[in-house]
């Protein structure tokens, strides 16, 4: 067994099949800010609301842990357009952009949502998966 981690993994399954997952955790050196590290949905079921429901579940989990701010970092490239749309339609704002962060022409974009100001969305029932260190 490795050391304990602050990462939280949640997995959504239908009929035993993994349809999506998220990974999030507290942002180091902050009090109440969390990072969404990963969100992934099976390509065959994208567009069915699973991404929104997983985001809502993360928001609930963060608030249950006394968190109030959720940050998501992503790329500015066209291949991440669907992810950016998911965040924006979920009430996240692009608060910062760092030009050429990943490489020339690929900028880091930081999306943020204040969970104390946002209305509650419907969350999915998901399985908790222990972090692997």
Predicted feature residues:
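Flexible nucleotide-binding loop
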Residues: 48
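Short hydrophobic/aromatic beta-strand or adjacent loop that forms the aromatic wall/cage
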Residues: 7, 106-110
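Residue-level signal for beta-strand positions within conserved beta-sheet cores that form or flank
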Residues: 32, 68, 107
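Acetyl-CoA-dependent GNAT
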Residues: 1-44, 52-57, 61, 65, ...
């Amino acid at each position: 067994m490795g050391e304990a981690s602050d990462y939280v993994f949640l997995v959504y399954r239908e009929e035993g099949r993994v349809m999506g997952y998220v990974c999030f955790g507290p942002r180091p050196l902050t009090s109440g800010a969390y990072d969404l590290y990963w969100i992934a949905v099976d390509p065959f079921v994208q567009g069915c609301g699973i991404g929104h429901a997983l985001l809502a579940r993360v928001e609930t989990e963060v608030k249950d842990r006394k968190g109030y701010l959720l940050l998501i970092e992503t790329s500015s490239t066209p291949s991440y357009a669907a992810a950016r749309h998911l965040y924006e339609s979920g009430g996240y704002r692009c608060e910062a952009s760092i030009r050429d962060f990943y490489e020339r022409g690929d900028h880091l974009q930081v999306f943020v949502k204040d969970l104390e100001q946002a209305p509650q969305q419907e969350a999915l029932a998901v399985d908790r998966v222990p972090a692997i260190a």
